[in-house]
Design a protein with these regions (language model features):
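Interaction-mediating elements
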Residues: 1-133
């Protein structure tokens, strides 16, 4: 399951935050096939003045609105799956009024042994060991 950190500006109403998180989750289900009940989400709010970006980097004309920053920690995925996730997120979030030019996504791959979902246990390694019998 990926760990997704959603960084947004202060002041978004709770219903909008909830809708945003559900839309992002639906994108992961669609692009990566994660379970409907999967995924872990952390939502951080920051002050607009705390984000400083190059508004024209890579020839992308960003608006004066603060970007939506997504940080994804996940087991390794293929280049094709990453590209598909980027495309689906941009497409679906644009429907909510988030300009694709203002969407910043970073994926940090991890290995199975890098995860514990509680109890101080590496569940993914146990799952791997159990499937080898």
């Amino acid at each position: 399951m990926p760990l997704i950190t959603i960084n947004i500006t202060e002041g978004m109403i709770e219903e909008s935050i909830d809708h945003l998180q559900k839309t992002i989750h639906a994108c992961f289900v669609r692009a990566w096939g994660i379970p409907e009940n999967g995924g872990f989400y952390v939502i951080n709010e920051y002050k607009k003045s705390r984000v400083r970006i190059n508004r024209n980097m890579w020839g992308i004309q960003r608006s004066d609105q603060p970007p939506l920053l997504l940080q994804i920690t996940s087991s390794p995925r293929s280049k094709e799956l990453k590209i598909e996730l980027f495309r689906v997120l941009a497409e679906e979030l644009e429907k909510q009024g988030i300009r694709k030019e203002d969407l910043f996504i970073s994926i940090s791959p991890t290995q199975r042994e890098d995860w514990s979902f509680g109890n101080g246990v590496a569940q993914l390694l146990q799952e791997e060991a159990n499937s080898s019998f």
